[in-house]
Regions:
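Glycine-centered hinge/linker elements that transmit conformational signals in sensory
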Residues: 26-57
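Paired acidic/hydrophobic, glycine-rich loop segments that form the ligand-binding mouth/hinge
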Residues: 74-79, 96
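Short helix-initiation/N-cap motifs at beta->coil->alpha
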Residues: 55-69
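Extracytoplasmic/periplasmic substrate-recognition and gating elements
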Residues: 49, 88-156
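Long, aromatic- and glycine/proline-rich binding clefts that accommodate carbohydrate-like moieties
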Residues: 98, 152-206
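Extracytoplasmic/periplasmic solute-binding protein
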Residues: 1-30, 44, 73
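Beta->alpha turn/N-cap motifs
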Residues: 61, 78-83, 113-115
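Pocket-flanking alpha-helical
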Residues: 10, 63-67, 82-90
Length: 228
């Protein structure tokens, strides 16, 4: 999926699993690193050699999931709710969950997406102590092991707490596979102010590379635009 829907995810999977990524060890943008250039050239090569879906610039992750369910794609990177997606779509396919392939000498890295439950302290509030007590009561209620586990199942999310992870893995082998993968997750550098431009930029790099433009030049230009 190199579409405007999730093209930044494709960039992540290939670069992270080649030892690259969006930023370097100092959290500075490193979009044109050697590892990224190599990874993206490899990905484009897979497309050009006919090893992928035929139109990655227009076929979204949902199209890919349907192709996988129909037996038209042998291997795909998918979300933890893929079992439900396939079942709801009436697909019957024999498959297993595995770690994402990585280049020799590189760790396997998966994509992590984190939703946050946050509250904010108001030091000027005269009743802040009572507010804190109410918030604590709610958090204790929400993160009760049984209740929180049920909520994860209902939403199709993966848990934050180890106790919920243990409960879900015990009851469902599917959950166990996904929980194991959590340990290898990276996250987008979404707190950096340039992230929106980077996200759009790497998608444009992919799509222009699919049209035949030089990957090194495209990433050099993006790095210059973002980091100066």
């Amino acid at each position: 999926d190199m579409t405007t829907d999730e093209g930044q995810a494709a960039f992540s999977y290939y670069t992270w699993n080649n030892g690259g990524g969006f930023v370097d060890e100092n959290n500075d943008w490193a979009l044109n690193s050697d590892a990224n250039v190599e990874a993206l050239n490899y990905a484009i090569g897979l497309v050009n050699d006919g090893y992928t879906n035929s139109d990655p610039a227009n076929e979204t992750r949902y199209d890919l999931q349907d192709m996988f369910g129909a037996g038209k794609v042998a291997m795909m990177i998918g979300p933890n709710n893929i079992p439900t997606y396939l079942s709801d779509g009436g697909y019957e396919v024999n498959y297993e969950v595995a770690s994402i392939p990585s280049n020799e000498g590189c760790d396997s890295v998966a994509m992590g997406v984190c939703d946050r439950l946050e509250v904010f302290k108001d030091d000027a509030a005269e009743d802040q102590e009572a507010r804190t007590a109410a918030i604590t009561k709610f958090f204790d209620f929400f993160y009760d092991d049984s209740r929180y586990s049920d909520y994860m199942i209902y939403e199709g999310f993966l848990p934050t707490t180890q106790t919920a992870a243990d409960l879900l893995a015990k009851d469902d082998e599917t959950f166990a596979s996904w929980i194991d993968i959590l340990q290898s997750c990276n996250f987008y550098p979404a707190t950096k102010t340039e992230w929106a431009d980077v996200k759009q930029g790497v998608i444009e790099v992919e799509q222009n590379a699919l049209l035949g433009d030089d990957v090194q030049t495209l990433l050099d230009d993006l790095q210059a635009d973002i980091a100066g």
